[in-house]
Regions:
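Mixed-charge (Asp/Glu-Lys/Arg
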Residues: 1-39, 44-189
Length: 189
């Protein structure tokens, strides 16, 4: 695929999700069309039962999803790991379900994969993987809290990470469960 700037990539993902929601029979609108870059919400959606979802869309060309949060949120002011503070931050920032879009293929024949997680599932996945990353690695020097948090695409298929000399095993809290095309997760919490 050609070099796509970040804003265009985000718009591509949002429009693909919007199209899919409309095809599924939902009423949906991209919030950024009427509200200037509404934080944490990209699409409002309503189903036939008048349930609403405030959806965050994350789009990638890579094999992982940048969740838009850095490790610093899981540290206290003294630089110590503070998982409770990280969880509190996740619960305040993540306001609804997420649809993660992986774009591949070519410019003339793009392919889109959709991974749908409820708000609760997103929080649990990020929290548990961050707990593992911050506490179950053999590090010679402590982390500074810099750097972004990513969810590798294999994790969205329910895969974990085997132990090695650098870290303990990470057992995916959704082991064996694929989030691909799980649109019903929009309505779960």
């Amino acid at each position: 695929m050609a070099n796509i700037n970040r804003n265009n990539l985000g718009a591509i993902g949002e429009h693909q999700v919007l199209s899919r929601l409309l095809l599924l029979g939902y009423q949906a609108a991209i919030t950024n069309m009427s509200v200037d870059n509404m934080e944490n919400i990209d699409i409002f959606c309503r189903d036939s039962q008048n349930r609403y979802a405030a959806i965050q869309v994350k789009t990638t060309l890579a094999n992982d999803i940048n969740v838009g949060i850095n490790h610093r949120k899981f540290f206290d002011d003294n630089g110590n790991v503070d998982l409770a503070a990280g969880l509190e931050y996740l619960e305040s920032k993540i306001v609804g379900p997420w649809v993660m879009v992986q774009v591949s293929g070519t410019d003339s024949d793009p392919l889109f994969k959709f991974f749908i997680m409820s708000r609760k599932q997103v929080i649990e996945m990020i929290y548990d993987s961050e707990r593992w990353y911050l506490t179950d690695f053999n590090r010679k020097k402590p982390l500074s809290g810099n750097g972004g948090i990513y969810l590798p695409i294999p994790w969205l298929y329910g895969n974990g990470v085997v132990a090695n000399n650098n870290h303990k095993e990470w057992i995916n809290p959704f082991s064996g469960h694929s989030f691909e095309n799980q649109w019903q997760n929009l309505w779960n919490d």
